[in-house]
Amino acid sequence: MALVNEHFLKLPGSYLFSDIAKKVNTFKITHPKRDIIRLGIGDVTRPLPKACIEAMHKAVEEMTSAETFRGYGPEQGYDFLIEAIIKNDYAPRGIHLSPTEVFVNDGAKSDTGNIGDILRHDNSVGVTDPIYPVYIDSNVMCGRAGVLDTESGKWSNVTYMPCTAENHFIPAIPEKRIDIVYLCYPNNPTGTTLTKAELKKWVDYALANDTLILFDAAYEAYIREPDIPHSIYEIKGAKKCAIEFRSFSKTAGFTGVRCGYTVVPKELTAATLEGERIPLNRLWNRRQCTKFNGTSYITQRAAEAIYTPEGKEQIQETINYYMTNARIMKEGLESTGLKVYGGVNAPYLWVKTPNGTSSWRFFDQMLYEANVVGTPGVGFGPSGEGYIRLTAFGERDDCIEAMRRIKNRL
């Protein structure tokens, strides 16, 4: 008899965004003539950069000829893309990487969810709270998260580090030792950031406690202020304690194309029970060769085009578009008296609900009264209660109209 992985049965009945979709669909059935503006899920709306489209067309044409046809590619990614990544994303910041330290993937979500494959199931886990749900759910699936306390919404083997207005959304360094810590900066969902000095405290903690930092830098392209690190490897010693995840989804509109990459430094190691130090780069490479057949050649050529002069210019135009949306939304919400965080170095706005209203209650008010969809903050963790997340990835006119509705109807 085949037995199931019973850890999956511990997961909530559905994913956060599935719950939102059900509520929105119910509303649409009962209010078919209402025009809904979606500012909840972080999907993009601007088209792919022209440079990427042209590169994809060229790559498709190559597939029509036996001389230039490409079949299976390297599981780690093609050299042309890896070299472009190192040259453009790391070398200008004084970060030196070997090509074998970069692994191209089909989006950061895959690797942030799968990285646990190379780590023991009983490692302790620390997360900032609120947090991207994938970090928690992927640890639940392998049994690492422990048991859920339904009253608090917390898992027994997870240390939650609250990020609230009271601590300026800066997580406190844990007093106890934690094996694995997830950090995402610029942060999803709060849109806030850490300075280099603040991030250095985490690197120092990790080095002192033999802690592995899993650093999600998917939104680094949106950073505007000078003292905000784009990579954890800007901090001395980080290569000995951190894995970094990057994505082209929000940088270049690749949410439907699917491409990103993970950096696993060769000097990063973890221990066996006997105390032997094992390079995580070697384990991750072995895992990828077994479970991943590589990102498509056509997709990787499109990603390479991001780093051309034309690609860089076109991507910056798109990022500026979304960040202008963020400014318009932030100003619009603040004009109604709402307290808004984020939206300066990230395309997310973290809105405090008025008068102590719960996250889901305010979600319903926005949906039914303003016909605007956000994401309830409590869906990102216990410290998200009393907040709602809005994204700046919508069309400009929709963002303006949504602010008008919120101001006039709520």
Swiss-Prot record:
Substrate binds at Y15, G42, K109, Y132, N188, N293, R389. Homodimer. It comes from the Bacteria. Signal peptide: none annotated. Keywords: Aminotransferase, Pyridoxal phosphate, Transferase. Its EC number is 2.6.1.83. InterPro entries: Aminotransferase_I/II_large, DapL/ALD1, PyrdxlP-dep_Trfase, PyrdxlP-dep_Trfase_major, PyrdxlP-dep_Trfase_small. Pyridoxal 5'-phosphate binds at Y72, A108, K109, Y132, N188, Y219, S247, F248, S249, R258, N293. Pathway: Amino-acid biosynthesis; L-lysine biosynthesis via DAP pathway; LL-2,6-diaminopimelate from (S)-tetrahydrodipicolinate (aminotransferase route): step 1/1. It catalyses: (2S,6S)-2,6-diaminopimelate + 2-oxoglutarate = (S)-2,3,4,5-tetrahydrodipicolinate + L-glutamate + H2O + H(+). The keyword Transferase applies. One of its GO terms (molecular function) is L,L-diaminopimelate aminotransferase activity. The gene is dapL. Involved in the synthesis of meso-diaminopimelate (m-DAP or DL-DAP), required for both lysine and peptidoglycan biosynthesis. Catalyzes the direct conversion of tetrahydrodipicolinate to LL-diaminopimelate. Belongs to the class-I pyridoxal-phosphate-dependent aminotransferase family. LL-diaminopimelate aminotransferase subfamily. The modification N6-(pyridoxal phosphate)lysine is found at K250. Its cofactor is pyridoxal 5'-phosphate. This is LL-diaminopimelate aminotransferase. GO terms for biological process: lysine biosynthetic process via diaminopimelate, diaminopimelate-aminotransferase pathway. It is an enzyme of class 2 (transferase). Coiled coil: none annotated.
